[in-house]
Amino acid sequence: MIESQRHSYHLVDPSPWPISGSLGALATTVGGVMYMHSFQGGATLLSLGLIFLLYTMFVWWRDVLRESTLEGHHTKAVQLGPRYGSILFIVSEVMFLFAFFWASSHSSLAPTVEIGGIWPPKGIGVLDPWEIPLLNTPILPSSGAAVTWAHHAILAGKEKRAVYALVATVSLALVSTGFQGMEYYQAPSTISDSIYGSTFFLATGFHGFHVIIGTLFLIVCGIRQYLGLMTKKHHVGFEAAAWYWHFVDVVRLFPFVSIYWWGGI
């Protein structure tokens, strides 16, 4: 028998996923340190920790979707929590990328004597910003327009149109990731080539990692939309994915200007 409640908040049931996620994160961290320092068993512990962590993420999000879609626990008051959490998460990611861009700008504006006082350091090859980087830059903002199209389609109750828009968004995202892979393959330097290589691959790679995560997020939203699991009133997961994607596509402009173009002159 289901007991009635006089409030609009969801009192969650006891869950094993917080502790399992913590153990997975611990194993991943310790295994990563052991692997980097060539300790025996480091690679095994790292692999097991990652698998355990990914499994926990999957089943935890599965439970959240069940609570919202099948059990109807996500009232308007409950939906505010994921919205605020998504916004704060994006703000924290902005701080991450800001730190990497700051490191690149600091190193290029005041090059040390160890690299000859010039930027880029002598002997370090740089990518031509007017080739693949320029071609890749407008793709993500275009995908941002497509995800906005999907949002408007969901609000209008046009399910098929929303699916088409999400397919277009994911397709553009995959093209962008492919271009970045080509760019890395053709790069004349590596991450170990002085501070230039370190900051270049760290900043652009971290952004590329965000693109991959956002693509997976949108693929899940596309599948749920295709199955009819999102409505005009209940699509918080899609809103979080759209906000995250707009963050990703806008940020793309900063590495092009500050790292590819200005930092590579």
Curated annotation (Swiss-Prot):
Subcellular location: Mitochondrion inner membrane
SUPFAM superfamilies: Cytochrome c oxidase subunit III-like
Mode of membrane association: Multi-pass membrane protein
Alphabetical UniProt keywords: Membrane, Mitochondrion, Mitochondrion inner membrane, Translocase, Transmembrane, Transmembrane helix
EC number: 7.1.1.9
Domain of life: Eukaryota
Gene3D superfamilies tied to this protein: 1.10.287.70, Cytochrome c oxidase, subunit III, four-helix bundle (1.20.120.80)
Reaction(s) catalysed by this chain's protein: 4 Fe(II)-[cytochrome c] + O2 + 8 H(+)(in) = 4 Fe(III)-[cytochrome c] + 2 H2O + 4 H(+)(out)
A single MF term (Gene Ontology): cytochrome-c oxidase activity
GO CC, one annotated term: mitochondrial inner membrane
Alphabetical list of InterPro entries matching this protein: Cyt_c/ubiquinol_Oxase_su3, Cyt_c_oxase_su3_dom, Cyt_c_oxidase-like_su3, Cyt_c_oxidase_su3-like_sf, Cyt_c_oxidase_su3_a-hlx
Pfam family, one: COX3
Signal sequence range: none
Residues annotated as transmembrane: 16-36, 41-61, 84-104, 162-182, 200-220, 245-265
Gene Ontology annotations of biological process type: mitochondrial electron transport, cytochrome c to oxygen
Family: Belongs to the cytochrome c oxidase subunit 3 family.
Subunit architecture: Component of the cytochrome c oxidase (complex IV, CIV), a multisubunit enzyme composed of a catalytic core of 3 subunits and several supernumerary subunits. The complex exists as a monomer or a dimer and forms supercomplexes (SCs) in the inner mitochondrial membrane with ubiquinol-cytochrome c oxidoreductase (cytochrome b-c1 complex, complex III, CIII).
Function as written in the Swiss-Prot or TrEMBL entry: Component of the cytochrome c oxidase, the last enzyme in the mitochondrial electron transport chain which drives oxidative phosphorylation. The respiratory chain contains 3 multisubunit complexes succinate dehydrogenase (complex II, CII), ubiquinol-cytochrome c oxidoreductase (cytochrome b-c1 complex, complex III, CIII) and cytochrome c oxidase (complex IV, CIV), that cooperate to transfer electrons derived from NADH and succinate to molecular oxygen, creating an electrochemical gradient over the inner membrane that drives transmembrane transport and the ATP synthase.
Protein name: Cytochrome c oxidase subunit 3
Species lineage: Eukaryota, Viridiplantae, Streptophyta, Embryophyta, Tracheophyta
